[in-house]
């Protein structure tokens, strides 16, 4: 899988919050987006995940995300906010399963969900921590989750 952004900019009113950002990240790669508070990191990620309007191009395996319907996109990509935004203490498995809500709906049965969660836990090497409270994870483990 490859996620690419080309010349992405985000406006809030007349103020440009994100200016001309480009990146590409593929399976097995990590991408670090860093900067001071207010630099636009979360805004960029919100745009890439289709939560905010933007100019430029964001593609997943070469397909413009704006052309993808929400459900097929949610099957391939989800964004989970920072842990500080979570109001309750969940297990690792519960947090990973939250990524499936956009795919299936909050109150819908989740056929194949357990297998998808297991694959995700294995992909980030957290399968042995599945029942552990997220507040007990190290910083690196939280990032992988």
Where are these regions (language model features)?
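Conserved structural motif at the start of ABC-family nucleotide-binding domains
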Residues: 3, 18-20
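The feature captures the beta-strand-to-loop junction immediately N-terminal to the Walker
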Residues: 34-36
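Helix-to-loop junction immediately C-terminal to a conserved catalytic motif
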Residues: 48-49
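Conserved ABC ATPase "signature" region
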Residues: 97, 111-129
């Amino acid at each position: 899988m490859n996620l690419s952004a080309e010349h992405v900019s985000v406006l809030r009113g007349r103020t440009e919050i994100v200016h001309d950002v480009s990146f590409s990240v593929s399976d097995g790669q990590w991408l670090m987006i860093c900067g001071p508070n207010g630099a636009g990191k979360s805004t960029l990620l919100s745009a890439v995940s289709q939560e905010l309007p933007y100019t430029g191009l964001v593609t997943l395996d070469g397909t413009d995300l704006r052309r993808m319907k929400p459900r097929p996109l949610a099957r391939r990509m989800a964004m989970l906010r920072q842990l500080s935004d979570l109001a309750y203490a969940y297990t690792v498995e519960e947090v990973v399963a939250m990524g499936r809500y956009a795919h299936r709906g909050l109150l819908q049965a989740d056929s194949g969900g357990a297998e998808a969660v297991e694959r995700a836990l294995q992909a980030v090497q957290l399968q042995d921590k599945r029942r552990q409270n997220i507040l007990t994870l190290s910083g690196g483990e939280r990032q992988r989750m």
